[in-house]
Swiss-Prot record:
Belongs to the baculoviridae E56 family. Keywords: Glycoprotein, Late protein, Membrane, Transmembrane, Transmembrane helix, Viral envelope protein, Virion. The lineage of its organism: Viruses, Viruses incertae sedis, Naldaviricetes, Lefavirales, Baculoviridae. It is a multi-pass membrane protein. Glycans are attached at residue 178. This is Occlusion-derived virus envelope protein E56. The chain crosses the membrane at residues 150-170, 322-342. Pfam families: Baculo_E56. The gene is odv-e56. It comes from the Viruses.
Amino acid sequence: MSFFRGLRRTNKVYNDPSGFITDHAQLIRNQTPAGFNLNNPTTMGLANGTYVPGYNINGAFISNTNVNTVLRNNDVVGMRQLFPDASNNQMNGLTNLRRADNIPDATLHGLQTRKNGVKTSHPETAVRDRVGVENALAQNPRLADYLRGAGYVTLFGVSVYLVINVADLVSSIVEALNRTGGSWYYRGNNGGDNFSNIDACVLRYRSCGMSLADIDEFVCELDPHDPNNVDPLLSFDEARNFCNGYSLAAEGSVCRGSDTNADPSTLQYLDISELEPNQTVQCVEPYDFGDLIGDLGLDWLLGENGFVTASSNSLTSVSNNFTTILLVIGGILLLTFIGFVIFKVVNRSSNNNTS
């Protein structure tokens, strides 16, 4: 039993608090690496009579789900907050444990961090409509030039693809955004530490707010010989009925059963404890332009001056050039005048000598 396997097996709610105490003793206590204090298991009761497992860490209740998320994601900031006594070497040591279990979460977390960074640094990209996309392209001309110069090609990311129509680039981008979203199922292999080693597909029957046309190219085929194998945790009948009564307005997500960090009383909550450690399910909400830029790895094209600033710079440049021209002309006139004075003086001196 590996450390991350034990964390995964206990990432659920319990009907009896003693159940977690027993599981912790069998699955986690003797597998916990040095520096990570998980020696005080406890639970917190919910209104429906179930119990959230967790730990008393530095006098505070920290849910087991939170511990799972932080450690699987390689969330260094989160680890320092939860485990301030852990050294850099101890935190780095978790990388080998994640790699041994082929855990994909750190790679996925890195992508999410990049997407968030794009929108934090360039808030104009947090848009989904034509006007917003046009404005973002105008403020980032190098990105616009790159996309227009790419020609009629398709750019592939992790959860999105962009079919570029040079004749109407903005429509191409908006259409790509409208195709994003859904319950994504990730499986790590060969370490799971880069996207080349992560298999990804969309779980159709958990993607309640997405039309099949928008996700069809990504829908999971878990077993080519068994069309009824459509979900890693649900039977075919359970899957077919999973979205009954779905309401985007009421639920606020395009997914059901795809978020381990959701309130356990909601339809968005996922009991992931039966999945292998190298697998995870995450809800990807529909992208905005900043998400698309981060997913396609185009963030290096951001940051140049936009049209208005560029125009201002052009005017400044023209003004500077005009000043330079005036200075050159003035210098030439001054040199001509000095030359004329010298010529007159020399000529007068020559005439006096002749006389």
